[in-house]
């Protein structure tokens, strides 16, 4: 028997819970190790607030919020020889970005990316897109480097050096970072 106390609020709450259930179940399948979860940490005085610092060997990204204070996130980084190093700026930010492999990726891995050769096809944004929920585009001197800080469909890659060069984050973590970081932010990858 259906209760007459079934209000609009109850309907909305029940519907929202139902929509989130698949995401919740998916998130429960893999728990990121504790050290790679976002946490506030102290950083050196020499690191200016308002910038991103990425330490690929330790698989951490730091958003420096204030003097001596940063949010540290675990990341996945590029395989040896494919990683980005140096300084860039975030010139573009996108929610649920489209994706296509770079020409170098197509050449390096034709078995995986051959269907993209000789065309401009791109995968639309969405839950199965390798760039995940958000992407921050790295530029040098106004030119796209084709390196990104982005979400991932492979959360187990966090803490590993397995990508084609980009910096991968858990989708909820990159969404949090996306909201904090403005266009023009300096990114240093050591």
Regions found by a protein language model. Give the residues of each.
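Short aromatic/basic micro-patch
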Residues: 5, 130, 168
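N-terminal secretory signal peptides and thylakoid transit peptides that target proteins
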Residues: 1-18
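Gly/Pro-biased beta-strand-loop elements
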Residues: 32-147
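Histidine-centered active-site/metal-ligand motif
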Residues: 150
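Short Gly/Pro-enriched loop/turn and capping motifs at secondary-structure junctions
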Residues: 141-143, 154-156, 174
